Design a protein with these regions (language model features):
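Compositional signal for N-terminal targeting/processing segments
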Residues: 1-531
């Protein structure tokens, strides 16, 4: 990676990112050693600072920071502590090297960004971050979005938002003691009223844009306050926000000097996530995230401090490549498949799997395959059993916290189940195009209810099986002899004897050559046709 890895604005070194993508986490770690910042600023609200740091400190175990405005929430906002996320990597690096980390974002109620298809971030390795960002910023979608922001930004005030938020909180606290549980009739009336209002999509868009403007003004205000105090600031922020933040930094008169402590949430909790649920929390294939964790361990602070040559230092930092891990997934699955099913996958089929997954990826306008492309390639070239092995290897996340220090939330694609049996709706967005395990592109395979269930059933019923090993061995040897004899006969029938001209083909036909040598003095060869 010889290209620039950051965007510089005065004394701020910016890494615009896509969240939960390991390529951007790699950029953050590389840029730390290029910049050696006095301060790291991240796009997270300050009123969950301690919980996020606690979650980062317990990595590689996965955590989920859930927070809400009420004490008994039905809908939770959450921040996944994803090891492959660039913001989490920035916080982790700051804690590791004892660099101050500032959370500069504004906390908003029920903030939900609209979904969108993102380009493949693997291209950063070839074109560099500034060029990658420039291409995205020039897209019509982002140009139109920025134009909408400029139209309504004058009517959006961060200070007014804080004042309204404080009043809203006070009003809610006064009503909490008096309000009773809403009846089903009231809920139905509310739903009917909401259905009659039928808000327009444009209004939803404006509300979302207003929230983005509030956040960007608040982040710009914090950066303006910090810039005179530090020589080098490393800023890790979402790709869609930097252009507007830069605009407010260039026009400081358009933002207020906001110096208000954000109101803490009434419900903030750290949940442990089991390794088996990692695929619901991580956007990257869990195997990629696992390899990133192992890479960081191998080249930890102690190991990197021993490297003296700068070129060798950055070559090591950039040596993590997802493309090599895709090969490892297929090869590891091949080994497990051959061990369990006693069927061999030859090099030709393995090469075909690589080519198939590559071509399938290109047809989906991507550079590297996601899990879906890996499964389709494995299924179509080999079979469903091999595809299941690929799924198991790719989805495996080996780090599981069994200390029970934190409550564990069970995750699905629909939401999360707390230990007390309370179902909460979450807003996870991952890269898999299916919603349930049954939607995988393979025949569904039953799972054991508990480890060793099938072995236990076999031990219970093994004496009911009509079989006698000595006789079985004799029968199997006889079947093997018949099979071998049949193949030999078929092979002999497909041998053609030809006169030697330019090629020995499959060897000299000794009998035919000797038989005709006395009067023809010609050599004959065998042409064995495959069965």
């Amino acid at each position: 990676m010889n290209q620039e890895t950051f965007i510089k604005y005065k004394n701020i070194y910016i890494v615009p990112t896509f969240h939960s993508r390991v390529e951007f986490a790699k950029l953050v770690r590389t840029n730390y050693f290029k910049v050696f910042p006095d301060l790291i600023a991240v796009e997270l609200p300050s009123n969950i600072r301690e919980e996020v740091k606690e979650g980062v400190n317990r990595l590689p175990y996965l955590s989920l920071i859930a927070y809400a405005d009420s004490l008994s929430p039905d809908l939770l906002n959450f921040i996944p502590i994803d090891p492959s996320d660039s913001i989490i990597e920035a916080i982790r690096t700051g804690l590791e090297y004892k660099v101050p980390v500032e959370f500069i974002d504004l906390s908003l109620k029920t903030y939900k960004p609209p979904p969108g298809k993102l380009p493949d971030d693997f291209s950063i390795n070839k074109i560099g971050l500034p060029h990658f960002y420039q291409i995205i910023a020039e897209q019509e979608k982002y140009k139109g979005y920025d134009a909408q922001k400029l139209q309504i930004e004058q009517n959006v005030s961060v200070q007014e938002y804080f004042e309204k938020e404080i009043l809203r909180r006070q009003k809610e606290e006064q009503q909490e003691a008096q309000e009773e549980i809403q009846t089903q009739e009231a809920v139905n009336q509310f739903q009917e009223g909401a259905a009659q209002e039928n808000p327009q999509i444009e209004e939803e868009d404006i509300r979302h844009i207003e929230k983005d403007i509030l956040r960007e003004k608040y982040m710009a205000s914090n950066l303006l306050r910090m810039m005179p105090l530090y020589n080098r600031i490393l800023l890790v922020v979402g790709m869609a926000h930097w252009n507007s933040i830069k605009y407010y930094l260039d026009h400081p008169g358009k933002i207020e000097n906001v110096d208000v402590d954000q109101v803490p949430f009434k419900y903030v909790k750290i949940y442990n996530i089991k390794s088996s649920d990692a695929r619901y929390l991580l956007k990257e294939i869990p195997f990629h995230t696992t390899q990133w964790i192992k890479f960081r361990r191998k080249y930890s602070k102690t190991a990197l401090d021993q490297i003296e040559d700068p070129s060798e230092f950055f070559a090591i930092l950039n040596s993590y490549q997802k493309i090599t891990h895709i090969r490892k997934i297929f090869l590891k699955a091949k080994k497990e498949y051959e061990k369990e099913f006693k069927e061999f996958i030859d090099l030709h089929r393995l090469k075909t799997i690589f080519q198939y997954s590559r071509n399938l990826t290109f047809t989906n306008d991507m550079l590297l395959p996601r899990l879906y492309q890996l499964l389709i390639a494995a299924k179509n070239i080999v079979d469903d059993d091999y595809a299941w092995k690929v799924y198991e290897i790719a989805s495996e996340y080996p780090f599981n916290d069994k200390s029970e220090k934190y409550e564990t939330m069970d995750l699905t694609t629909l939401g999360g189940m707390t230990p007390d049996g309370h179902f909460v709706r979450l807003r996870p967005r991952h890269a898999y195009p299916y919603s349930q395990k049954s939607d995988l592109p393979m025949k569904e395979r039953p799972d054991e209810k508990y480890e060793g269930e099938w072995r236990e059933e076999w031990e219970k019923n093994k004496w009911r099986t009509v079989s006698y090993p000595p006789e079985d061995i004799i029968e199997e040897d006889y079947f093997h002899f018949i099979r071998k004899k049949a193949l030999k006969n078929l092979k002999n029938e497909r041998i053609r004897i030809e006169e030697f001209k330019s090629s020995l083909m499959d060897g000299i036909a000794i009998k035919e050559t000797i038989r005709n040598w006395a009067y023809e003095q010609k050599i004959y060869v065998k042409n064995e046709q495959k069965i």
